[in-house]
From Swiss-Prot:
Known role: The A subunit of protein phosphatase 2A serves as a scaffolding molecule to coordinate the assembly of the catalytic subunit and a variable regulatory B subunit. Involved during developmental process such as seedling and floral developments. Seems to act as a negative regulator of PP2A catalytic activity. Associates with the serine/threonine-protein phosphatase PP2A catalytic subunit C and regulatory subunit B' to positively regulates beta-oxidation of fatty acids and protoauxins in peroxisomes by dephosphorylating peroxisomal beta-oxidation-related proteins.
Subcellular locations according to the entry: Cytoplasm, Cytosol; Nucleus; Peroxisome
GO biological process assignments: regulation of phosphorylation
Entry keyword set: Acetylation, Cytoplasm, Nucleus, Peroxisome, Repeat
Record's keyword annotation contains Repeat: yes
Assembly information from the UniProt record: PP2A consists of a common heterodimeric core enzyme, composed of a 36 kDa catalytic subunit (subunit C) and a 65 kDa constant regulatory subunit (subunit A), that associates with a variety of regulatory subunits such as subunits B (the R2/B/PR55/B55, R3/B''/PR72/PR130/PR59 and R5/B'/B56 families). Interacts with B'THETA. Interacts with SRK2E/OST1. Interacts with SIC/RON3.
Ranges in a coiled coil: none
Alphabetical list of Gene3D superfamilies matching this protein: Leucine-rich Repeat Variant (1.25.10.10)
Official protein name in the record: Serine/threonine-protein phosphatase 2A 65 kDa regulatory subunit A beta isoform
Length: 587
């Protein structure tokens, strides 16, 4: 092929591949657009490639999605920002297709391209695109239009700004609910670009239209707009325009709208300020906490700590706590679970006395809840309460419940308790721990569930680190070594695991005198799984013990295992022997 023809080659391949029946080839060629554009050069990309893409009416959504994505980053390949406008026609076409994800990606790319365009080009090219989309015959075009107003508006001259505001008003009143939903979703972004004088008039009237929409799917999106608009308005305007809407929404006939209010209420409080929150929004929140729809109560319960943080403790105790008490015995387990996941955070907000008087009884009732997730959510946050009421009170009031949960029938609850033990141990101190929790830690090593046994072995290591090797030598090692003769091989394996974890904490001397002999005895076990685990443990002990011990005790044991009839035992024994040789060579 001659040099002259070479630049033609990629575009020819591309056009062939773009028309190919095989979707994978079409996709690959779209994803290589930037490479092809570089080969063509900026001018030919503008004059040949982009028009070709504009006319390309591929019917496969995956190909169109890839094209919408590529065009968003295409400015460098068409000659920079001064030519960015040539990318608008193909993106405009893509923003009117039927498939939602393609339209959304095209709108995202339009915004990306538009935000880099020069002001004069925005006025000449981008604003006319917005107007065409907003007046589109198909609802898909009008839906996409809503997402690009905030890019077009700031650089528009005053006359055009007025026109754009009136177009957006029309979209808020469109016949199709899909368009009104898009208008509600994007109102906050558009409002952020509108001058404050028009914000109070035009934008607020659009907002009011949306809040009174007969479709709940539109109203619930308007709820999100409340928080966004609230942040743009002065506090007094916010109280005048936004607050009544929120209060109405909190009593909306559709539970989905009330659910959105419950989810957004914290942000709305920030917008209106502390005083209106106390007088208007606390009653609204209380209504949501007592809503007859469980989904709404779940959303409201999950925000209870956040909401209390912006109130003073007296108001929280007076108005919110009675609802929290009711929710702790709610008929829906999911409501109780949502409450349990955040209620511990209320302790620092309410302070020590109120926590002891009001919250502790609620914690206790949730710790005894029949639904395991509720119990789990309380256990995992106990440290937040400990910081407020102190360990003495925590141990008197909650510890009996914790001990009970250590034998819970749901293994995940037992697991959460085990993971909490080292923290509890460090706070309770060694004396208290030995009295109340020591026996439990041993009991878990013989649990029916493997994850519990594994966590129990890890727990012993963390306790040995917390209280030191001497304490471990007295309270952990003898009990662990006693269990090594358990008739069930799975429990014997747990003990080997515990030994391998304890050895680095206990140090060389105790490992050689107490732990290693037990491992060597286990190497004579009749169960192959035990023997290959012995090989793994011996490998982990090599760096801990002296070289002489490795040669005198560990190597002979491994050599014996390497001649075992079982293939896995031989494999792990040889791996450990290899490890010894490597250590020898490096030293």
């Amino acid at each position: 092929m001659s040099m002259i023809d070479e630049p033609l080659y990629p575009i020819a391949v591309l056009i062939d591949e773009l028309k190919n029946d095989d979707i994978q080839l079409r996709l690959n060629s779209i994803r290589r657009l930037s490479t092809i554009a570089r080969a063509l050069g900026e001018e030919r990309t503008r004059k040949e490639l982009i028009p070709f893409l504009s006319e390309n009416n591929d019917d496969d959504d995956e190909v169109l999605l890839a094209m919408a994505e590529e065009l968003g980053v295409f400015i460098p390949y068409v000659g920079g920002v001064e030519y960015a406008h040539v990318l608008l026609p193909p993106l405009e076409t893509l923003s009117t297709v039927e498939e939602t994800c393609v339209r959304e990606k095209a709108v995202e790319s339009l915004c990306r391209v538009g935000s880099q365009m020069r002001e004069s080009d925005l006025v000449d090219h981008f604003i006319s695109l917005v107007k065409r989309l907003a007046a589109g015959e198909w609802f898909t075009a009008r839906v996409s239009a809503c997402g690009v107003f905030h890019i077009a508006y700031p650089s528009a001259p005053d006359m055009l700004k007025t026109e754009l505001r009136s177009l957006y008003t029309q979209l808020c009143q469109d016949d199709m609910p899909m368009v009104r939903r898009a208008a509600a979703t994007n109102l906050g972004k558009f409002a952020a670009t509108v001058e404050s004088a028009h914000l109070k008039t035009d934008v607020m009237s659009m907002f009011e239209d949306l809040t009174q929409d007969d479709q709940d799917s539109v109203r619930l999106l308007a709820v999100e707009g409340c928080a966004a608009l609230g942040k743009l308005l002065e506090p007094q305007d916010c109280v005048q325009h936004i607050l009544p809407v929120i209060v109405n929404f909190s009593q909306d006939k559709s539970w989905r709208v009330r659910y959105m209010v419950a989810n957004q209420l914290y942000e709305l409080c920030e917008a209106v300020g502390p005083e209106p929150t106390r007088t208007e929004l606390v009653p609204a929140y209380v209504r949501l906490l007592r809503d007859n729809e469980a989904e709404v109560r779940i959303a409201a319960a999950g925000k209870v700590t956040k909401f209390c943080r912006i109130l003073n403790p007296e108001i929280a105790i007076q108005h919110i706590l009675p609802c929290v008490k009711e929710l702790s015995s709610d008929s829906s387990q999911h409501v109780r679970s949502a409450l349990a996941s955040v209620i511990m955070g209320m302790a620092p907000v309410l302070g020590k006395d109120a926590t002891i008087e009001h919250l502790l009884p609620i914690f206790l009732s949730l710790l005894k809840d029949e639904f395991p997730d509720v119990r789990l959510n309380i256990i995992s946050k106990l440290d937040q309460v400990n910081q407020v009421i102190g360990i003495d009170l925590l141990s008197q009031s909650l510890l009996p419940a914790i001990v009970e949960l250590a034998e819970d029938r749901h293994w995940r609850v037992r697991l959460a308790i085990i993971e909490y033990i080292p923290l509890l141990a460090s706070q309770l101190g060694v004396g208290f721990f030995d009295d109340k929790l020591g026996a439990l830690c041993m009991q878990w090593l013989q649990d029916k569930v493997h994850s519990i046994r594994d966590a129990a072995a890890n727990n012993l290591k963390r306790l040995a680190e917390e209280f030191g090797p001497e304490w471990a030598m007295q309270h952990i090692v003898p009990q662990v070594l006693e269990m090594v003769n358990n008739p069930h091989y799975l429990y014997r394996m747990t003990i080997l695991r515990a030994v391998s974890l304890l050895a680095p904490v206990m140090g060389s001397e105790i490992t050689c005198s107490k732990l290693l002999p037990v491992v060597m005895t286990a190497s004579k076990d009749r169960v192959p799984n035990i023997k290959f685990n012995v090989a793994k443990v011996l490998q982990s002990l090599i760096p801990i013990v002296d070289q002489s011990v490795v040669e005198k005790t560990i190597r002979p044991g491994l050599v014996e295992l390497s001649e075992d009839p079982d293939v896995d035992v031989r494999f792990f024994a040889n791996q450990a022997l290899q490890s010894i040789d490597n250590v020898m060579m490096s030293s």
